[in-house]
Swiss-Prot record:
Binding positions for CoA per the UniProt entry: K129, S186, K187, Q236, Y239, Q240, H282, K331
UniProt source species: Danio rerio
Pfam family, one: TMEM120A-B
Gene: tmem120aa
UniProt-listed GO biological process terms: detection of mechanical stimulus involved in sensory perception of pain; fat cell differentiation; monoatomic ion transmembrane transport
Protein name per UniProt: Transmembrane protein 120A-A
Ranges of the Cytoplasmic topological domain: 1-131, 177-189, 240-269, 330-341
Signal peptide residue numbers: none
């Protein structure tokens, strides 16, 4: 409970106490700034040391390859051991750099400027990752209900525009947050990040598509697709988050690993039942692309959005389908090799 002085004597005593506290605050803040300067110097020293190590390891690796042909078998084994150790270093450096400031990529530089987005402790990183996952879950549920409303309950172009605007904002926000998470040590496969840029572009084109005969022809199909995709994404989040939790507890996954709108190798154990739902979603994208290209053959076609959306849906299909297929193929190949051993 705060002390409220009443008389002059009490006020003067309170002032003296406040002065002492003020001096203590100044000393603490001065000490804090000094430590920050020390941390900055340590960060610069560590970053430059890692860069120097990388260069020297690269040069050493090339020199060892040249030496292999001119040494005896015993020395070849030594070289192999060194090369194995060299191969492990990039992963260690990656873990170190997750706690060091780094230059933003082109996208983050354009959006945020030269702002340091590296979080310097594990608690902050995990809290940001957890907040990202919750954001995806809440927006997925919202988009599912919004698309259902537009498909079955409301049929106004202005409501469709609000839905598409929400999609643009959602995917834009995802790309920014994912870039920050990558800066902080999350390993997200290239396509699963890039597809969000493609989806942002697609949603933006859908937003600008004027109301007309062709728009109305494609509207219900697009909303049905949106409902299905959001349902699958919710389904994926539910099962992927549980699987990631178990794998982290076993020490088989990194704390900064994320749920994705696709299939990755770590999902092979226990989540293969998701594959039919994913492939159906991929072929839905192909169906949308074909439908839109067929619309360009109609005499009513005059909007550029028809061709652009059709091309974008085909890009999404090819990227999603072949990336997922590649993961499945590599897992089968790995299993065959394991059986052969």
């Amino acid at each position: 409970m705060l002390f409220n002085p009443t008389g002059l004597t009490e006020c003067l005593q309170e002032w003296e106490d406040l002065e002492k506290d003020y001096q203590q605050i100044q000393d603490t803040h001065r000490h804090y700034k000094h430590k920050l300067e020390e941390v900055s110097k340590l960060q610069e020293s560590c970053s430059s040391s890692i860069a120097r190590q990388r260069k020297k390891l690269k040069d050493l690796s090339e020199s060892l390859e040249e030496c292999k042909g001119a040494v005896n078998p015993e020395d070849v084994n030594k070289i192999d051991d060194i090369q194995e150790s060299i191969k492990e270093r990039p992963n260690v450096f990656f873990e170190m750099e997750a706690f060091l400031p780094k230059k933003n990529g082109l996208y983050l530089s354009l959006v945020l400027g030269n702002v340091n987005v590296t979080l310097l402790n594990k608690q902050s990183k995990f809290a940001y990752k957890d907040e990202y996952e919750k954001f995806k879950l809440y927006l997925t549920v919202l988009l599912l209900f919004f698309s259902f409303t537009c498909r079955f309950l409301v049929s106004y172009r202005v409501v469709d525009a609000l839905f598409n605007f929400l999609l643009v904002w959602y995917y834009c926000t995802l790309t920014i947050r994912e870039s920050i998470l990558i800066n902080n040590g999350s390993k997200i496969k290239g396509w699963w990040v890039f597809q969000h840029y493609v989806s942002t572009f697609l949603s933006g084109v859908m937003l600008t598509w004027p109301d007309g005969e062709l728009y109305q022809m494609f509207r219900n199909q697009f909303l049905s697709y949106s409902m299905y995709i959001n349902f699958v994404q919710f389904f994926q989040y539910y099962y992927q988050s549980g699987c990631l939790y178990r794998l982290r507890a076993l020490g088989e996954r990194h704390n900064m690993d994320l749920t994705v709108e696709g299939f990755q190798s770590w999902m092979w154990r226990g989540l293969t039942f998701l594959l039919p739902f994913l492939f159906l979603g991929h072929f839905f994208q192909l169906y949308n692309g074909i439908t839109l290209f067929q619309m360009t053959q109609l005499p009513e076609w005059k909007e550029w959005q028809v061709l652009m959306c059709g091309s974008t849906f085909l890009v999404l299909f090819m990227g999603n389908f072949f990336t997922t297929l590649g993961v499945v193929y590599h897992k089968y190949m790995d299993q065959d090799k394991a059986k052969g051993l």
